[in-house]
Amino acid sequence: MKKLMIAVGVSVLLGACAGGMGGSSGGMSSTNPMVGGAAMYPTKDIVDNAVNSKDHTTLVAAVKAADLVGTLKSPGPFTVFAPTNAAFAALPAGTVDTLLKPENKPTLTKVLTYHVVPGRMDGPALMSAINAGGGKAVLKTASGGTLTATMSGSNVMVTDAKGGTAMVTIANVYQSNGVIHVVNKVLLPG
């Protein structure tokens, strides 16, 4: 029964991307979902795609402030759980402005790299890891912390070190150097 539920979850996760428009095949997928009103091209890297999403302007500004552009343009591969502008706006008042100050660059870098998992973990790989882990997958982040991925009904949920949980709202946005999963909350390291 558990395997059937996981199989249904994989189908829903993959099906969520089927209606999206995308660019040409980059060897990964014939289509990519639209993100923030912009086409995402599997032949472009994470940064070159993210700058076009109107839903990720805060994330892009933070990546620039933390000097992570070069890293996220490198070959990777990376899996990025990308919080939306609304996710950043839901943080306590003043948090984003404080993080973007030059003196807080180490903290900002830690928060951002906590959203990055080395390697390419698309939906099927993530679901396989959840299944292999008996319903949860512990993911080691680029910051050295861990995230826990689980299923809640047909949704993939990602839980941070503080117990906060984000839902993957758009999965499998393939990039030349990895894959992005859009999430609805900012994940915070311990």
Regions found by a protein language model. Name each.
Residues 4-6, 18-190:
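Mature, structured domains of secreted/extracytosolic soluble proteins
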Residues 13-16:
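C-terminal motif of bacterial Sec signal peptides marking the signal peptidase cleavage site
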